């Protein structure tokens, strides 16, 4: 049977960012240095395939520190943690390694610096996301107000409209955040923002690549986990950019082939915590059903690399 032709636009950049790469290395190096088990508070990154792979090597994933014994190392996830968590680990004299992405740590430092100058912080982020919890937890309760939408801006009650600063979660939609920032600046003209926006380079680059491929594709798939904020934003960006069918898939098994019946073009991207192995699996699934021509659409080249903490670079 002759296969139908299909042009597959492969968005670039896609997949692992420097912060995710570093976090995974931290877990692997910790297991190598201290042996199994090494405990990890929260999924190190939001990807089941990655987490299952590390679990097989000896990582034990827990949600809270009280699930960890005092005598085993614990790693904090790439999303960042409230200040109370390392303080508790120190009180218990635990060995811990902080795998917080350096770009998230930068937001933590910004928030603290503004607070030291007497400013109340407004955080643009998603309620309940570990990164938002971690950033808000750098300061005492009530010092950071959360806004998720433009509508929230009109509702928040601030201490002093002239003494405000804002920070953002690093994995948001660039366009949505721009609208929220504009609403904040309209309501609070004296609000102070970051020197350079907090949305990370990888989030921005992946969204721009999706915008480049979405309008010319009959469908677009984002390889990523349902709990991955940046992956879900890529699906939203694709829909807004004019792609009529944009879906999140964890791997090739999740593809709804009936929904793709009759397509001539498809685009594929991947969230920042999705390994390239899963992207290749998706491409292979299309090759099995179509006569595929792959076209890479590259909108940026990334050379960012973050060092692992010194404790893991020293011999045991």
UniProtKB/Swiss-Prot annotation:
Pathway stated in the Swiss-Prot or TrEMBL entry: Isoprenoid biosynthesis; dimethylallyl diphosphate biosynthesis; dimethylallyl diphosphate from (2E)-4-hydroxy-3-methylbutenyl diphosphate: step 1/1; Isoprenoid biosynthesis; isopentenyl diphosphate biosynthesis via DXP pathway; isopentenyl diphosphate from 1-deoxy-D-xylulose 5-phosphate: step 6/6
Alphabetical UniProt keywords: 4Fe-4S, Iron, Iron-sulfur, Isoprene biosynthesis, Metal-binding, Oxidoreductase
Cofactor: [4Fe-4S] cluster
Cofactor note: Binds 1 [4Fe-4S] cluster per subunit.
Single biological process term from Gene Ontology: dimethylallyl diphosphate biosynthetic process
A GO MF label: 4 iron, 4 sulfur cluster binding
Annotated positions binding dimethylallyl diphosphate: 46, 79, 129, 228-230, 273
Active site, per annotation: 131
InterPro entries: LytB/IspH
Residues involved in [4Fe-4S] cluster binding: 17, 101, 200
Keyword Iron-sulfur: yes
Superkingdom per UniProt: Bacteria
Pfam families: LYTB
Residues bound to isopentenyl diphosphate: 46, 79, 129, 228-230, 273
Disulphide bridges, residue numbers: none
Listed EC numbers: 1.17.7.4
Binding site for (2E)-4-hydroxy-3-methylbut-2-enyl diphosphate: 46, 79, 129, 170, 228-230, 273
Catalysed reactions listed for this entry: isopentenyl diphosphate + 2 oxidized [2Fe-2S]-[ferredoxin] + H2O = (2E)-4-hydroxy-3-methylbut-2-enyl diphosphate + 2 reduced [2Fe-2S]-[ferredoxin] + 2 H(+); dimethylallyl diphosphate + 2 oxidized [2Fe-2S]-[ferredoxin] + H2O = (2E)-4-hydroxy-3-methylbut-2-enyl diphosphate + 2 reduced [2Fe-2S]-[ferredoxin] + 2 H(+)
Family classification: Belongs to the IspH family.
Function per UniProt: Catalyzes the conversion of 1-hydroxy-2-methyl-2-(E)-butenyl 4-diphosphate (HMBPP) into a mixture of isopentenyl diphosphate (IPP) and dimethylallyl diphosphate (DMAPP). Acts in the terminal step of the DOXP/MEP pathway for isoprenoid precursor biosynthesis.
HAMAP family named in the record: IspH
PANTHER family named in the record: 4-HYDROXY-3-METHYLBUT-2-ENYL DIPHOSPHATE REDUCTASE
Name by which UniProt lists this protein: 4-hydroxy-3-methylbut-2-enyl diphosphate reductase
Source organism: Ruegeria pomeroyi (strain ATCC 700808 / DSM 15171 / DSS-3) (Silicibacter pomeroyi)
């Amino acid at each position: 049977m002759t296969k139908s032709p299909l042009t597959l636009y492969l968005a670039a950049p896609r997949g692992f960012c420097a912060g995710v790469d570093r976090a995974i290395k931290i877990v692997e190096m910790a297991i190598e240095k201290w042996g199994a088990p090494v405990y990890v508070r929260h999924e190190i990154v939001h990807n089941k395939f990655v987490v299952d792979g590390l679990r097989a090597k000896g990582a034990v994933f827990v949600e809270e520190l009280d699930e960890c014994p005092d005598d085993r190392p614990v790693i904090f996830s790439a999303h960042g943690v409230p200040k109370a968590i390392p303080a508790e680990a120190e009180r218990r004299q635990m060995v811990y390694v902080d795998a917080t992405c350096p770009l998230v740590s930068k937001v933590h430092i910004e928030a603290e610096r503004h607070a030291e100058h007497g400013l109340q912080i407004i955080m643009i982020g998603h309620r309940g996301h570990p990164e938002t919890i971690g950033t808000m937890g750098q300061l005492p309760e009530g010092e950071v107000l959360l806004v998720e939408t433009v509508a929230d801006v009109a509702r928040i009650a601030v201490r002093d409209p002239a003494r405000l600063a804002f920070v953002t979660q690093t994995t948001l939609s660039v366009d949505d955040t721009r609208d929220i920032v504009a609403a904040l600046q309209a309501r609070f003209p004296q609000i102070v923002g970051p020197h350079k926006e907090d949305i990370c380079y990888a989030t921005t680059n992946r969204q721009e690549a999706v915008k480049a491929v979405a309008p010319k594709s009959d469908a677009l798939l984002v390889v990523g986990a349902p709990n991955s904020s940046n992956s879900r934003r890529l699906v939203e960006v694709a829909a807004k950019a004019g792609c009529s069918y944009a879906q999140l898939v964890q791997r090739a098994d999740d593809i709804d082939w009936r929904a793709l019946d009759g397509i001539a073009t498809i685009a594929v991207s991947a969230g920042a915590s999705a390994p390239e192995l899963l992207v290749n699996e998706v491409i292979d699934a299309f090759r099995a059903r179509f006569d595929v021509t792959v076209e890479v659409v590259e909108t940026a080249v990334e050379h960012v690399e973050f060092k692992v903490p010194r404790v893991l670079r020293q011999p045991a």
